[in-house]
């Protein structure tokens, strides 16, 4: 009889255990603990590096990540560079395939098909956003699900919503790991997720509200989702009662100190480039008024240096999952046996 393997551990996805879940969170603090996403990401990348070393030492092929980058968007080029640097850091080989913004949708689909069928490619992602003439949803669904390290394919999204094993989207998984590794309890807690995007807000809500005893980790929280049509005063009515607020709307200063109760944990996923009124230089800001909110919150993530580094780290973990083919049908059967 085969030795039982913890399925969540095999996927690198772990859940809170009931004995570690605390029911207290909102005790007043003088100032928030600023969670360093960079520090947590270094820890995860170290784990990934060790996992790759063990995998290769066992005689397996080194994991390989292919990134398709379309156009000349400076932010996209910067993000892709960060991803390939992280891959090199953990021992994953990678390539960036550059294509002009004039590429047709058919040509891009043909390229993805070739990469899907390339046995040397373990993980595959197409950097978003894409030019307006290309259907992003069609492109995301063209990537084969077990190579879909972004976790955007409809099959991976569907499996995640059904609490089944799937390739988790990197940013939501990064938010989950921040909460879990920081020790912020979620069992029975009130959570507000500001933002309902299919790649960020919705998956974060799914991870936080589902049953922690199921295949895929869940936080057992009571989750409220707001969006662009939620009036600010109505949003405040929800956030003022929330133990955890996750801001993922892409609206600078959406969450202010008067909207947060004492001792709440605040995770800022938003990232917007604005011009500093004093220096006239551009800088990155989140959705949260950091200076004001940190005086009331118990935990808070900064922008930059919070969720961003975690997104890249979780992408590396997904590439390893893809290389080990843990989401192939036969592997899934073994995990659930």
Swiss-Prot record:
| Catalytic reactions on record | (6R)-5,10-methylene-5,6,7,8-tetrahydrofolate + NAD(+) = (6R)-5,10-methenyltetrahydrofolate + NADH; (6R)-5,10-methenyltetrahydrofolate + H2O = (6R)-10-formyltetrahydrofolate + H(+)
Instruction: Give the matching Gene3D superfamilies.
Output: Leucine Dehydrogenase, chain A, domain 1 (3.40.50.10860), NAD(P)-binding Rossmann-like Domain (3.40.50.720)
Q: Which CDD domains is this protein grouped with?
A: NAD_bind_m-THF_DH_Cyclohyd
> Where is it located?
Mitochondrion
Q: What PROSITE patterns would the database entry show?
A: THF_DHG_CYH_1, THF_DHG_CYH_2
Q: Does the keyword Repeat feature in the UniProt annotation?
A: no
Q: Which cofactor does it need?
A: Mg(2+)
Q: Which is an annotated GO molecular function term of this record?
A: methylenetetrahydrofolate dehydrogenase (NAD+) activity
Known role: Although its dehydrogenase activity is NAD-specific, it can also utilize NADP at a reduced efficiency.
Its protein name is: Bifunctional methylenetetrahydrofolate dehydrogenase/cyclohydrolase, mitochondrial
Q: What is this organism's lineage?
A: Eukaryota, Metazoa, Chordata, Craniata, Vertebrata
Q: Which gene encodes it?
A: MTHFD2
